[in-house]
Amino acid sequence: MIPTLKAEFKKLLTVRSTYFITGLVTAFVIFITLYVIGWRMNIHDLHDPAQLADAATGALTMSVFGAIVAVLLMTHEYRYNTIMHTLTSSNSRSKVLFSKFIVASVYALFLAALIGILSPTMVYLGVHLHGHMLVPQTLHYGNLAWRVLFYGWGFGMAGLLLAVLSRNQIASIVGLFVIPDVIEQLFGLLLKHNTVYLPFSSLNQVIGNSGGRTDTSSNLSPSKAAGVYCIYLVVGWIIGWYLFLYRDATKLD
């Protein structure tokens, strides 16, 4: 298990796209939070005690890039035809998949923590560089930390799961944008208030994002929303694990 895990970390850390995406996300978050939100903040928002907490969760939409890194970690194997070597170098397909799961989780948590810490820090800095001052902020660190980390991890696991199911890089990346922004929105027209139980809708509610819905009275609590999302992940990963074990088994093993 350890050699397989080391090999997966090596793949993550030797691919240029990992550093490019991390740098891109960092630069974008700094620009948006330091200048657009912090420097240009209006006087009314300076009196909002939840401004920094909102900044920490608001920028988490960039976690989709953590999911893209997870997609690349899996689909590069199929795109460059290295999957046979990866599978034959380990005595268990489950170990390979679990190693990718761990590596993708570590990166997703790292990126979420980076965004969650960088965002409020840059907002605070932007406000002060402009000569203003925020009112005393209300920050429930424990509650904020688990929601930030869960959201980033949840998006990363969704990306990796899509990659396991489709084995196609383009389809997986497109799915990360189309499923929450198009498909779930269409289902919302039919499900009405029950839209809150859809996968990405429940994930959004972990950080208090209504996903564009105007009626938030039916919103789930963050902990309940996390539980709903975990159910989807468990079911999805059982299917993904089964397919990874037995799809093309005679061809690749």
Feature-to-residue mapping (PLM):
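Transmembrane helix-loop junctions and nearby membrane-interface residues
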Residues: 33-40, 74, 189-192, 240, ...
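Transmembrane helix boundary and interhelical loop/hinge segments in multi-pass membrane proteins
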Residues: 70-89, 93-94
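Binding-cleft/active-site segments that stabilize strongly anionic ligands or cofactors
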Residues: 174-175, 190
